[in-house]
Swiss-Prot record:
Superkingdom per UniProt: Eukaryota
Protein name, UniProt field: Large ribosomal subunit protein bL20c
GO terms (BP aspect): ribosomal large subunit assembly; translation
Cellular component GO terms held in the UniProt record: chloroplast; ribonucleoprotein complex; ribosome
Subcellular location(s) per record: Plastid, Chloroplast
Family: Belongs to the bacterial ribosomal protein bL20 family.
Gene3D superfamilies hit by this protein: 6.10.160.10, Ribosomal protein L20 (1.10.1900.20)
Its biological purpose: Binds directly to 23S ribosomal RNA and is necessary for the in vitro assembly process of the 50S ribosomal subunit. It is not involved in the protein synthesizing functions of that subunit.
SUPFAM superfamilies, per database record: Ribosomal protein L20 (SSF74731)
Gene Ontology molecular function: rRNA binding; structural constituent of ribosome
Keywords: Chloroplast, Plastid, Ribonucleoprotein, Ribosomal protein, RNA-binding, rRNA-binding
């Protein structure tokens, strides 16, 4: 049986990882061991930050909604709005509410004033 040299296969594998780390600075884009380490770190960071991005956007949406609500009505807060939305079974998520808050503040004020009216009617019936 003939001997198979694996130099070309190893070179191809290293070239693939080199392409992945081509944007790194210094030795991290040139030396094979450092490229491997950098690749692992980059992929770990990407995985972690995909989840972090979701949390960051949720915080941003909540901040925007709360800011618009507190500008218009002093005694009303974000938590009260979300509680009342759930009670009335309105299917508006935080992303949609934040978009409404940015594009048309009057529309958001109409939504929470309608919720307040419904809430007072329910209290009057009890």
């Amino acid at each position: 049986m003939t001997r198979i040299k694996r130099g070309s296969i190893a070179r191809r594998r290293r070239a693939k990882t080199r392409l992945f780390a081509s944007g790194a600075r210094g030795a991290h884009s040139r030396l094979t061991r450092l490229i491997a380490q950098q690749t692992i770190r980059a992929l770990a960071s990407a995985h972690r930050d995909r989840d972090k991005k979701k949390r960051d956007f949720r915080r941003l949406w909540i901040t925007r909604i709360n800011g618009v609500i507190r500008q218009n009505v002093l005694s009303y807060s974000y938590s009260q709005l979300i509680t009342n939305l759930k009670k009335e079974q309105l299917l508006l998520n935080r992303k949609m509410l934040a978009q409404i808050a940015i594009s048309n503040r009057n529309c958001l004020s109409i939504i929470y004033s309608a919720i307040i009216i419904l809430e007072t009617k329910e209290e009057g019936q009890k």
